[in-house]
Swiss-Prot record:
The keyword Metal-binding applies. This is Ribonuclease HI. Keywords: Cytoplasm, Endonuclease, Hydrolase, Magnesium, Metal-binding, Nuclease. It comes from Streptomyces coelicolor (strain ATCC BAA-471 / A3(2) / M145). One of its GO terms (biological process) is RNA catabolic process. The lineage of its organism: Bacteria, Bacillati, Actinomycetota, Actinomycetes, Kitasatosporales. SUPFAM superfamilies: Ribonuclease H-like.
Length: 231
């Protein structure tokens, strides 16, 4: 059995549900990306994209090599580590007695995890000086969701493009009060609230519970993305 491999996976959905994609990346000993893959899902939810990314990663790596998987999706991690045993005992029903969502993907992941050493590690998304592998997987998944085409090292694809300058984008609303002037004018509201649950903005970046969000034409997301879309 060889030393542990380090990898990350991520999913993206532009609309939730909307055009979606998945991606995974495996690093070398210095945690530089050396092998990666991304693919389209058509129209799908964030959760389907996240689970698909994990399923593809597990299916594409050697089961005899211990694996560390870095993810920014609490749902996908808890689904296959915390909730899965109870779902199986309950005949694939939740504690509320409802059918488990995305059961086929969860079952497939459970099969791929059987008999292999996998450690899951949660990493916050889109942090300054955050996890490099998570950032790579996030960019690859987002690009796959947008272009709806497969990509990866085996295809000779270039690395996924960098994410937009988030700090600069968040400064944009300070230039004036144009956002407030749009309230009630048929567009998106300028009002912001704190998210009760984590989700993903139309830009493809996730937001955490408690983070300020605003209404846009496709749902809820970052206030700066609402401003950009309105402009």
């Amino acid at each position: 059995m060889r030393e542990r491999a380090v990898a990350a996976c991520d999913g993206a959905s532009k609309g939730n549900p909307g055009p979606a994609g998945w991606a995974w990346v495996v690093a070398d000993a210095s945690e530089n990306p050396v092998r990666w893959e991304a693919g389209p899902l058509g129209k799908a939810t964030n959760n389907i994209a996240e689970l698909t990314a994990l399923e593809r990663l597990l299916a594409s790596t050697d089961p005899d090599v211990p694996l560390e998987v870095r993810m920014d999706s609490q749902y996908a991690m808890k689904a296959v580590t915390t909730w899965l045993p109870g779902w199986k005992r309950n005949g694939w029903k939740t504690a509320a007695g409802k059918p488990v969502a995305n059961r086929e993907l969860v079952v497939r992941i459970d099969e791929l995890l059987d008999g292999r050493s996998v450690e899951f590690r949660y990493v916050p998304a889109h942090q300054v000086d955050g996890d490099r592998l998570n950032d790579f997987a996030d960019r690859a998944a987002s690009q796959a969701a947008v272009v709806q085409e497969a990509a990866g090292s085996a295809l000779g694809s270039p690395e996924p493009p960098p994410a937009p300058d988030v700090p600069a984008a968040r400064r944009a609303p300070r230039r004036g009060s144009s956002g407030a002037a749009r309230k009630g004018g048929g567009g998106s509201s300028a009002r912001t609230i704190k998210a009760k649950f984590p989700g993903r903005c139309l830009c493809g970046r996730p937001y955490a519970a408690g983070e300020p969000i605003a209404k846009n034409d496709q749902g809820w997301g970052h206030p700066e993305c609402r401003t950009v879309a309105a402009g």
